[in-house]
From Swiss-Prot:
It comes from Mycobacterium avium (strain 104). Keywords: ATP-binding, GTP-binding, Nucleotide-binding. GO terms for molecular function: ATP binding; GTP binding. The keyword ATP-binding applies. This is Nucleotide-binding protein MAV_3359. The keyword Membrane does not apply. It comes from the Bacteria. NCBIfam families: PRK05416.1. Displays ATPase and GTPase activities. ATP binds at residues 18-25. Belongs to the RapZ-like family. GTP binds at residues 69-72.
């Protein structure tokens, strides 16, 4: 059984927050579809009251998700007090922080022709920057950070479902994400590894148009001197980290593997690493998926 359910007298609490335009509404809809009771834009001081109602005998609320944003007065300061107050009820709420790159947020606001809640007389970019600064302390203590910059609605739904669709699951959810350094670092990565030390298939004419998912490219990358040794060593390191996460009660982990463009080397290594993690730990202990962030961008 989920530790949050065991400690919380039968109620699991998730606080969904993050940057405006990063997908809080979509996350809320997915949670609602999964059977969670969702309260949107509930002021922090009313959260404990809602939890108390859910803990009352006869209440059918066992999974409560609260969507919060900076328009709630005293948001950042009150959030800590809410967590402290819930701790007195033996409830440790999980905080989900939604974010996206500045460029993507600007694009979304321009497409929807909406103003940012903190924009005021400033530019849209300045409003986004102000919110990012304001929410930095919240992001630093979040249990799960979801970067929606390159996620489709379907991919976001799958991410939420994996994290919260099985309330009784005690597995650790691991995402192995390939990316290209020239497109920037993944904002939600817990660990980043650079595999540009391996020869680049881009310079092999017959391999250039293919990707790291192609058997010929995979064999080329994994057959390079040092590739197998690197996989062995990095897999051992990740196994230690996974065990540490489990001891600390953490449930989510994103491992980013980068090469120049995110097309060949990082893709092949990410696929191989995912297979090794699955083979060693099994689905009962580890839920592993692979995500190729920049595949198809070239």
């Amino acid at each position: 059984m989920d530790a949050h359910l065991e400690n919380g007298a039968g109620i699991d609490v998730v606080l969904v927050t993050g940057l405006s335009g990063a997908g809080r509404g979509t996350a809320a809809k997915v949670l609602e579809d999964l059977g969670w009771y969702v309260a949107d834009n509930l002021p922090p001081q009313l959260i404990t009251r809602m939890v108390d109602l859910g803990m009352d005998a006869g209440s059918r609320i066992t999974q409560l998700a609260v969507v919060m944003d900076v328009r709630s007065r005293g948001f950042t300061g009150d959030l800590d007090s809410v967590r402290t107050e819930l701790a007195t009820r033996n409830i440790a709420p999980r905080v989900v922080f939604m974010e996206a790159s500045d460029d993507m947020l600007v694009r979304r606001y321009e497409q929807n022709r909406r103003s940012h809640p903190l924009q005021g007389d400033q530019t849209l970019a300045e409003g986004i920057a102000a919110e990012r600064r304001m929410l930095a302390p919240v992001r630093a203590t979040a249990d799960l950070i979801i970067d929606t910059s390159t996620l489709s609605v379907r991919a976001l739904r799958e991410t939420i479902e994996r994290a919260f669709g099985g309330g009784a699951s005690a597995t650790i959810s691991v995402t192995v994400e390939s990316f290209g350094f020239k497109y920037g670092l993944p904002m939600d990565a817990d660990m980043v590894m650079d595999v540009r030390f391996l020869p680049n298939p881009h310079w092999v004419d017959e391999l250039r148009p293919r990707t790291g998912q192609d058997p010929a490219v995979r064999d080329y990358v994994l057959g390079q001197p040092g590739a197998a040794e690197f996989l062995d060593a990095y897999h051992r390191l990740l196994s230690l980290v996974v065990d540490g996460y489990r001891r600390e009660g953490k449930r989510y982990m994103t491992i980013a593997i980068g090469c120049t463009g995110g097309k060949h080397r990082s893709v092949a290594i990410a696929e191989a690493l995912m297979q090794r993690l699955q083979a060693q730990h099994g689905e009962a202990q580890l839920s592993v998926r692979v995500l190729h962030r920049d595949l198809g961008r070239e």
